[in-house]
Structure formats: structure tokens, C-alpha cells
A protein has these predicted regions:
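Helix-loop-helix junctions within the multi-pass membrane cores of secondary transporters/permeases
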Residues: 70-72, 79-150, 327-408
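Intrinsically disordered, low-complexity non-transmembrane regions of multi-pass membrane transporters
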Residues: 1-11, 15, 66-80, 194-205, ...
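Hydrophobic core segments of alpha-helical transmembrane domains in multi-pass membrane transport
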Residues: 16-29, 43-53, 85-92, 122-133, ...
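Transmembrane helix-loop junctions in multi-pass membrane proteins
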Residues: 24-38, 58-67, 92-107, 126-137, ...
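Transmembrane helix-loop boundary segments of multi-pass membrane transporters
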Residues: 38-39, 57, 104-116, 134-149, ...
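Transmembrane helical segments that form the transport core of multi-pass membrane transport proteins
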Residues: 236-347
Length: 509
């Protein structure tokens, strides 16, 4: 009961600031129709309840499933079996990610199924790389430098229309379905190792899996022509209470089907392991089943609320604010929204909990949340600046990733892994359903190119936490070094006091 209250409090605290900001803007500088405002408020209630169910469900089901599958995979003691299972697992959970369908629709020149399978194969391939890294204790930083180097070299030859969507894909595909399972898989596999670095190596799976989709879409950009254009989504308005209710009720069956299709492959995969290898006790299995039900209900409510309530509000607010005499208000407003919106990402709480547990509280959830919020605030501010000025996204991504990769030389390894994991976690469904429509609405209002200038918000949100969390790691390292120096000082002072005495004189004293 206490845990439910805590989860409910977290969910309310995550969404209320966003609700307050939107209401404040609606009643002051950005007038919004009553219909869209009501849709947003009802959507916020759906999101709060959905977050509550999802956070409880992920803790009860997705995390223990991932850990046990990871441990079970290693029992085969055959590397090729482990890697083959890892690849198929990566493909299955990526295809099951709801946001991947949205991404596919954003690239009109590439057939949907080609893009989905390519991205899924990219995640599968890099999950194999991540598993090899854990099994052989390979450092994460050099891998990141090499793979991001390859990405930016390929990006040089890809049409501009593909760049923003390609980098967005890395954040979109590591969503609420993928993150809890992949992170738990890493914990399960690293637990087999007994060396002191095993705990640190359990992080970094999401970081590497985020690279696969980016590479996949960039490679598709070399093959397919950059044709097609962005088509603005209709903003539905309800003219009475019945129509308002229908907007939500019509979407619920769609997401019931969508999330069922997303969860079933993971449940099927786990079921095979349960029958062949894991064989959990009935009580544990029932708990996991209840957790899966919570996860299912939570994601259905969350995505219904976010898509029906948040997308129209974000799009409309962006359009209105960009049409004001001073459209630059978008930059500070975007930063404030970005600061608070990351708290409403479902997978963020999964990451924070795991970090606190594995570091024995040395890295607190609060410090991590503040670092994430600061990073996302900066990224949304820069994204709004791009919308208003049309600055190419690579002018931000190349220096940003260069700084992030440079910091890996000085930061404790665990902070590097957590930082690059957090990039994929921070850029979840809230970014896709509120921040991206905000940018699209603003871009349309100023007459910009939506494909080049508005898309890329997810990529920016995924990038800045890499820097802010590593800066947190640098501060942590400096403080730890100072503590060690202070602990050694009294001992050194005692040695200085007795330095002039002979051994027998010290004994007499």
C-alpha cells in the first residue's frame, strides 16, 4: 500500500507542472480553444493513472523477466546461442515498440515494413555488441567513439531530409517497452561475472542499442531517394461533451490492440524460457502475470492520454506562440516545459531506481533527475531556436556528441554508461507526443521546413543528458577525491608530530 502511494505521488508530481504551464500559457499569452484545453486536462488524468500502473507493472514484471532471461541465456554456455538469442530478442522487442510505427510514417520515401525491419535488425545487432561487451569486459567509451564516428561519416553522404529522422529514431525505439527489459537483461547477464567491474558493465545496453536505429535509417537514406513531405496532422476538436468522450473512447480500443501486439512477443519469448530453462515457482509467475497486466493497462491509458490530449495541445500552442509578435518566447517556454516533461517519461523512473540500487545510493535518483531535467531543458531550448532560425541539426549534434565523447576520458566509467543510457530513456513518448508537436506547430506557423527543422527534437533530447550526467559524474569524482584527501590528512599530521622522535622515545611517551 505504501509503495502504491509513493508511485501515485511520483506520477502526480511528474504531470502537474506540465498541466500548470499549459494552463498558464492558455490563460495569458497563447489562447487555446476550450475543447483542446479540456482534451489536454482529461489526457493529463489518463497519463497520471497510466504512469502509476506502468511503474508498478514494470517493477513487478518487465525487470524480473529481463534479469531471469539474461541469467538463463548464460546457462547454455555457448556463445553463438547467447548471441543468436540476443539478436532475436532485440528484433522482437523493437518491433513491439509502439513509437516505431510513428517513426515509420515520418519517412514517406521508405516503405514502412522495410524501415521497421531495418531498425529492428539494427537494435538486434547492437544488442549482440552490448552482450559481447558485458561478457568480455570491453570498455564502453571506445565503442561509443568508434560507432558515433562511423555514424557522422555516413551522415555526410545522406540527404538532409533523412538526418533529423535518423537521429530521432535512436531515441524513439528505446521507449517504455524496450528500456525496462533491456536494462534488466544487462543486470542478469553481468551478475554471472564476479569481477569488480561487472556492476558497471550492466549499464550501457540502451546506449549501444540506440546506435542501431540511427545507422539503419542513415543506410536507408543512401539507398532510397529523399522524397515526400510532412503532412500536418489534423487537430481534432470536440464541440460538446459527447464528442469529447468519443475522442478518448474511440482511441482506447486501438491502443488495447496496439499494446497487446507489443507485449505478446515479449511474453511469448519469456514463456519459452520459462518452459525450457527458468521454471519459476507458481507464486513468482503469478506476480509477473499481474505485473504484465498492470503494464498493459498503464501503457494503454498513458498512450491514449498522451496522443489524444497532449498532441493537439502541443501543436496548437506551438502554432499560437510562433505567431505572436515576439515568437522568441518559444525558446524560454520550451526550456521550462523541457525541464518538467522529462519527469513524466515512464522509463525514467525505471532507470533511476536501477541506478540507485546498483550504486548503493551513491548516485541519488534526485541528483540524476535534476541532471536529466537540465539537459532536456537545454535541448528543447536549442530545438526551438532551430525551428525559428532553420539552423541545420548537425551544427548542434556534432559539437554535442564531441563534448560528450570527450568527457568519457575523465568521468568514472559507470557515469558514462548511465549517461548514454539516459539519452535513450529521456526521449520517450512524452517527447514524441508533446514536444515534437510543439515544434511542428511552431515550424508550420513560421513557414519553415518541418522535416528538416522540427524533426530532430527527439535527437536533441537524447543528446544533452549525455553531457549533463557526465558533468554530474565529474563533480562526483572531484568530491570523492577531496574526501579521500581529507581522510588521509589526520594520519599524515600524526606522522609529522612524531617524525622527530626515535622509536624508543615514542614508546616512553
Amino acid at each position: 500500500m505504501e509503495k502504491r502511494k509513493e508511485k501515485a505521488k511520483e506520477s502526480i508530481q511528474a504531470v502537474l507542472p506540465i498541466l500548470f504551464i499549459v494552463l498558464l500559457l492558455s490563460f495569458t499569452v497563447a489562447p487555446v480553444s476550450a475543447s483542446i484545453l479540456l482534451e489536454f486536462m482529461i489526457g493529463a488524468v489518463f497519463v497520471i493513472i497510466g504512469m502509476l500502473f506502468f511503474s508498478m507493472g514494470a517493477e513487478m514484471s518487465m525487470s524480473p523477466m529481463g534479469e531471469r532471461v539474461g541469467g538463463s541465456m548464460l546457462k547454455t554456455k555457448k556463445l553463438w546461442v547467447i548471441l543468436l538469442l540476443g539478436f532475436f530478442l532485440g528484433v522482437i522487442i523493437t518491433i513491439s515498440e509502439p513509437d516505431l510505427q510513428v517513426l515509420a510514417a515520418q519517412v514517406p520515401s521508405v516503405p514502412n515494413m522495410v524501415l521497421i525491419l531495418s531498425v529492428a535488425a539494427g537494435v538486434g545487432a547492437f544488442l549482440v555488441v552490448a552482450l559481447l561487451r558485458i561478457l568480455f569486459g570491453i570498455a564502453l567509451a571506445p565503442l561509443l567513439v568508434v560507432f558515433y564516428g562511423v555514424i557522422f561519416v555516413i551522415a555526410r553522404f545522406v540527404p538532409d531530409n533523412f538526418l533529423a529522422v535518423a537521429f530521432d529514431s535512436g531515441g524513439v525505439t528505446t521507449g517504455p517497452m524496450t528500456v525496462p527489459f533491456i536494462m534488466a537483461l544487462g543486470v542478469g547477464i553481468s551478475a554471472i561475472r564476479n569481477d569488480k567491474h561487472a556492476e558497471n558493465d550492466s549499464f550501457g545496453l540502451v546506449a549501444l542499442c540506440s546506435i542501431g536505429p540511427v545507422l539503419a535509417v542513415l543506410l536507408l537514406g543512401l539507398v532510397y531517394p529523399a522524397q515526400g513531405s510532412y503532412v500536418a496532422a489534423d487537430v481534432p476538436e470536440a464541440f460538446n461533451s459527447v464528442e469529447l468522450g468519443r475522442l478518448f473512447l474511440y482511441e482506447i480500443p486501438y491502443y488495447l490492440k496496439e499494446i497487446a501486439g507489443s507485449l505478446l512477443p515479449i511474453v511469448f519469448f519469456f514463456g519459452i524460457f520459462q518452459l525450457v530453462s527458468i521454471q519459476l515457482h507458481k507464486k513468482t509467475l503469478i506476480k509477473i502475470c499481474v505485473g504484465l497486466l498492470y503494464t498493459y493497462v498503464g501503457l494503454v491509458l498513458f498512450l491514449t492520454g498522451a496522443n489524444v490530449g497532449f498532441i493537439p495541445a502541443g501543436n496548437y500552442l506551438g502554432t499560437v506562440m510562433a505567431s505572436l509578435p515576439c515568437p522568441w518566447i518559444l525558446v524560454p517556454v520550451g526550456m521550462v516545459i523541457g525541464y518538467f516533461i522529462v519527469k513524466a517519461e515512464p522509463a525514467v523512473y525505471v532507470l533511476m531506481k536501477q541506478v540507485e540500487e546498483l550504486t548503493d545510493g551513491d548516485i541519488s535518483g534526485k541528483a540524476m533527475q535534476i541532471s536529466l531535467s537540465v539537459g532536456v531543458a537545454a535541448s528543447v531550448g536549442l530545438s526551438m531556436l532551430r525551428v525559428l532560425t532553420g539552423i541545420p541539426i548537425m551544427y548542434f549534434l556534432i559539437p554535442g556528441y564531441a563534448i560528450a565523447l570527450f568527457l568519457t576520458l575523465f568521468v568514472p566509467k559507470i557515469f558514462t554508461a548511465i549517461a548514454f543510457d539516459s539519452g535513450g530513456v529521456a526521449s520517450g513518448p512524452m517527447t514524441a507526443t508533446f514536444l515534437l508537436p510543439l515544434a511542428q506547430g511552431a515550424c508550420t506557423a513560421v513557414g519553415g521546413d518541418v522535416v528538416k527543422d522540427a524533426f530532430g527534437v527527439v535527437a536533441m533530447v537524447a543528446m544533452t543528458p549525455l553531457i549533463t550526467l557526465q558533468v554530474l559524474g565529474l563533480i562526483y569524482k572531484i568530491k570523492s577525491n577531496k574526501k579521500e584527501e581529507m581522510a588521509e590528512q589526520p594520519l599524515l599530521q600524526a606522522e609529522d608530530v612524531f617524525a622527530g622522535y626515535a622509536d624508543d622515545a615514542i614508546i616512553e611517551l
